[in-house]
């Protein structure tokens, strides 16, 4: 017999990194308490506007979305393309800060929204799954932080030549660091 969570959402939803290690009880609680909802968007439809205060992070289930900046003259810069399984707006939802970017559907897309306001409350004495959810969110945010750091390292040099050298040397530096770490642990 299918659980409530599996009956409402496809099994792939709960295999996403955000829900890794969440018990069946936790998944059922997420669904029954209304923490999750899905919404479909057409190409170029705005999901979040700059200045919005949001309480839900989004996870792309199908299609893709752009995180973009639009300047005063209407020039649009795409900062990131979010593909299926990836999370967006988690920092704004968690910190309750106004969005500094727009989020727009790059193509017909389906997004799972997860309401973070509920995460501040405990669930009927069984909050082990909430702790796991917080840990998963932290892991996702830290991975994004590392990606941003790498992007900053690559764009900080002044010339294109220096940027390319930094970009190409990163894997070599990482491999050298890992080899040194391994030798140190022997």
Language model features by range: what are they?
Residues 1-43, 88, 92-93:
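Cyclic nucleotide-binding regulatory module and flanking cytosolic helices
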Residues 31, 35, 142, 146, ...:
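Amphipathic, well-packed alpha-helical segments that form the structural scaffold of globular domains
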Residues 45-107:
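Cyclic nucleotide-binding regulatory domains
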Residues 122-127, 148, 171-174:
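Basic, amphipathic alpha-helical hairpins
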Residues 134-146, 150:
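Long, low-complexity, charged/polar intrinsically disordered regions in eukaryotic proteins
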């Amino acid at each position: 017999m299918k659980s409530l969570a599996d009956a409402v959402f496809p099994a792939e939803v709960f295999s996403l990194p955000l829900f890794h290690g969440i018990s069946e009880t936790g998944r059922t609680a997420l669904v029954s308490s209304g923490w999750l909802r899905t919404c479909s968007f057409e190409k170029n439809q705005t999901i979040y506007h700059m200045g919005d205060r949001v309480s839900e992070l989004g996870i792309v289930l199908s299609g893709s979305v752009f995180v973009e900046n639009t300047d005063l003259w209407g020039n649009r810069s795409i900062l990131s393309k979010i593909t299926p399984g990836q999370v967006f707006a988690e920092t704004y939802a968690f910190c309750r800060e106004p969005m500094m970017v727009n989020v727009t559907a790059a193509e017909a897309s389906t997004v799972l929204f997860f309401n973070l306001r509920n995460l501040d409350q405990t669930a009927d004495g069984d909050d082990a799954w909430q702790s796991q959810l917080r840990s998963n969110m932290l892991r996702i945010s830290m991975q994004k932080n590392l990606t941003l750091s790498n992007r900053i390292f690559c764009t900080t040099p002044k010339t294109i030549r220096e940027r390319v050298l930094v970009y190409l040397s990163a894997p070599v530096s990482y491999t050298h660091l890992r080899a040194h770490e391994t030798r140190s642990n022997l």
